[in-house]
Every structure is written in structure tokens, then in C-alpha cells.
């Protein structure tokens, strides 16, 4: 395709087609939001923003994208075609506002061929990350001292020492020279589909509505750049989470693995995609319901409407509607979750 004719819609259509062809469930497309598309395959959840020029991403969009991704335990990725100065190169990870950026072809290589990039771009050029433990093991296996390997590779002894201790960022040319000497790959790939490979935060703008959900123990965190009003996060720990935390304290060598499991269990059971009535018309509520049902399906989290005025309906489209007077009469979160489940079943049977 002629580069002058490439549009955001072209890229978005190609990305959606690619993901669905390889087993991902994809959401509707959400223009004018901090993300355009959600995609899930088994435990992988990615949130995508599509741009032709990656420098058009605003700090506000990036911050909101990062927070929503962190809240959903998803991986945020920006797919772009060029920057202000250059076209994006294949199999290189760029960055804008601390969110990874790749070209459509790089995404294709990841999804189709399971080839993850190793090179990332930063100020000063291109870099790779060396596996320090592997480097040390290979050096010792080849009976090389730090100085001997350094001399052969034309770097300092201190540089090799730093690589082995984990300060492993270096130029691709240096890594290639070490690999030639050791006759083995030593660089680490960047798996953008893993949430622990992206720096994210969670939604933190707490709001004080609906007060009835807050009294049941939920934190309500709003998003101004998403197709829903807020995420309601349950603060009460389940017994399963408490047991995992005990396990965490007793097995220090598995800290990261268990912490990730805690996060998964906590988030999976504790998030509600939340929409408020806010004097919206029935037509507007129906449009919001369509978006919310779609996002709920992809993320795997329940959704609800909190309504103040009696509308003689227990769901909007397929999304349970809970009234503020019902919330006031509840004693705990379990009652709410039970009612959501009942109304969800009624909606599906209707």
C-alpha cells in the first residue's frame, strides 16, 4: 500500500482482521476514547490505540490508557505507522509516554509467528537487553574470565561484570559480538502481551457516586476517556486471596509469581464496570449499554447500571440495572453480586 494513502481506518481494519483470524475475541471500535480496541485470547488481554503518527498521542490519552490497562490487568499497546520524523521499523519497540509502540508488521510477527522483538528504541539509539545469568553461565562454560571475554569482545571488564549483574542494556552490535564469541543467543525478547512487561498504574480518580456502592465497600474510580463511567473495585479480601497472601509470606522465592496470582484473583472477582443514570435519556443509556456489554464480554468482568429513577426495567439491553434504593437495603457485597447474577440471567433469557 502507498504510504501516502494509509489511514488510521486502514490500520485499524488490518489489526482487527489479524487478531480475529488468530483466535482473539475483539471488541467494537471505540473512536474518540483513550483506546480503540480490546482483544482477548485465553489469559491474554490487550488494549490497543491505533495511530498513523504516534506523536499525535497526548499525555492525557496515554495516562488514561495506562490506568485502564492496569485496572483490567491488560497490556496496553500503541500501533502506529510513523513518527514525526521517521517510519517505524519492523521488530523494534518504541515508546510514547511510557507505553510501548510497535508497527502493524511487528504486531503481525508477534501474533502469527510468535516472534517477539528484542530491540527497543530510546534516546541515543537502539538497545537490547542481555540475560545476565545466561551470559555468566556461558562465559564459565567456555572457561573464560571476565577479562578474557571483555578483551575478545572489545569491551571493558567492568562492562561484562555489569551485564552479568543485571545492568544489561546495551547496543545490538555489542550483543551480537558477545553472541559470536559464546556461540549462543544471550538477548531477551520483549513480550508485550505479558502485563508485567508494561509499566501501568490503575485508575485513581475516586468519585463519590453512587454512594450506595461505596457503602457496600467498593471504591468507585472514574475514567473520562473511556466508553463507560467508572470501575467499581471491591475492597474486601476473599478467603482465597488471604490464603495466597499467607503463601506469599512463607515462600520468598516465589514472590513475583504469587503476587501476580493474587492480582489476578483479586481483580477477576472484584471489578465491576459501572455506569450511572445521570439524567441520561433512554436512548443514551441503550448506547452505553451496547458498549458496556461488549467490553464486559472481552474483559470478563461484570457490568451494571446504577439507576435512581424507577424505570420498570431490571436490565438495559443485557446489562443488569440496580436501583439506589435496592443498594441501600443491602448489607454486603455478596447480596449485590447475587442480584447482578440473577438479573444477568433474566436478561440472557429474555
Swiss-Prot record:
SMART domains: HTH_XRE
Disulfide links within the chain: none
InterPro entries (UniProt xref): Arc_TR_HTH, Cro/C1-type_HTH, Lambda_DNA-bd_dom_sf
Pfam families: HTH_3
Domain HTH cro/C1-type: 135-189
CDD domains found in the cross-reference section: HTH_XRE
DNA-binding feature ranges: 146-165
Superkingdom of source: Archaea
SUPFAM superfamilies attached to this UniProt entry: lambda repressor-like DNA-binding domains (SSF47413)
Signal peptide limits: none
Keyword line: DNA-binding, Transcription, Transcription regulation
Keyword Transcription regulation set for record: yes
MF terms (GO), sorted A to Z: DNA binding; DNA-binding transcription factor activity
This protein's name: Putative HTH-type transcriptional regulatory protein Msp_1143
Originating species: Methanosphaera stadtmanae (strain ATCC 43021 / DSM 3091 / JCM 11832 / MCB-3)
